[in-house]
Amino acid sequence: MNDKKHLGHQAKKRFGQNFLHNDAVISDIVDAINPEPGENLIEIGPGLGALTEPVIERAGKLSVVELDRDLAHRLRHHPFLAKDLTIYETDALKFDFSELATEEQPLRIFGNLPYNISTPLIFHLLTFKDKVKDMHFMLQKEVVERMAAGPHCKAYGRLSIMTQYQCQVFPVMEIGPEAFKPAPKVDSAIVRLIPHAHIENPVKDINALNTVCLAAFNQRRKTIRNTFKKLITEAQLAELNIDANLRPENLSLDEYKKLADFIVDNPPEAAPVKEKRRMAKNKMTEPANNNLNENSAPEVD
C-alpha cells in the first residue's frame, strides 16, 4: 500500500504535502475559522480540498493559492467546487496578498501550510497585516509553541517577538500525525493570528527589530553585553533599564523594542566592516525552517 498516495494524488516531498483526511479534525478546524458568506477568504495550499469544500459550503466562494500545478488543475476541473473558486497558481512566498484586499473586505487567510517553509511564509504574510482581519494556520506544534512563547523559556525567540509585536497569538488545537496522509513525524497545531488594530509604542523601524532579534538568538547562550558589545555599551544598556547580564531569552518584547530603537538612533557606523556585513545579511536572511518530514532541530527563531 502506498501511504504517500491519497485520492489518486502522490504527495510531493518538495512541497511538504501531507493531506488532512480526518473528518472530525477537519470539522473542528472549519468551526475555528468560522467562515461566513461575503467574507474575503483566502486559502493557502488547498491541496485536495479537505478544508476547501466545507469552507465553500459555509461561505459560498473562496480564493486559493496553490503552487502544485497538478492540484491546481484538479481544482479547476472539480465538478462541484470549480465554479466557486478563484485559483492563483503561484508561490505563496511571492504572492502579493494585498491585491485581494479592499477596505470593505479585509483578508481572512487560512491553510494547512507546508511546514518546510512555514517560518518565511509567516513573515511574508505579516507584511500584509494591515490588510488582514485574521489568519488560521496548521503548523508544526513546535512552531505554534514558539509563536506563543513568552520570556524565560526555551521556545521564546525571534518568531515569538516578531509575531507578538504584530498580532495576538491564540493556539487553538493540537492535532496528531494520524490525521494526515502521509503521516508526518511531528505533531501539529492550529494557531489563530489577529493583527493588532493599534500597536502601542511602535518601533521606529521593524527591520531593526528583526535584525536585533536575529543577532540575539543566533547567540542565545551569550549575555546581552557580549552579544551587542560592538553596538551598545553596558552603560547605555543601563540607561535603557536593560540588565547586561541577561541572556536573549530573558528580555521582554518591550526591551527588544528599546534595543531596536537605540540601533536606529545610533547606527553602527563605527562597527567593523565584517560586523556591518553580518548585520546586513541577517536582515535579509531567514533561518532554516521546520521540515514536516523530519524531526525538528533547534532554530534561532
Swiss-Prot record:
Region feature (Disordered) = 267-301
Cellular location of this protein?
A: Cytoplasm
S-adenosyl-L-methionine keyword on record: yes
Q: Which GO terms describe its molecular function?
A: 16S rRNA (adenine(1518)-N(6)/adenine(1519)-N(6))-dimethyltransferase activity; RNA binding
* Polar residues composition bias: residue spans: 287-301
User: Enzyme group, top EC level?
Assistant: transferase
The EC number(s) given in the record are 2.1.1.182
Record carries keyword RNA-binding:
yes
Annotated NCBIfam families: ksgA (TIGR00755)
Q: What is this protein called?
A: Ribosomal RNA small subunit methyltransferase A
Lineage, highest ranks first: Bacteria, Pseudomonadati, Pseudomonadota, Gammaproteobacteria, Alteromonadales
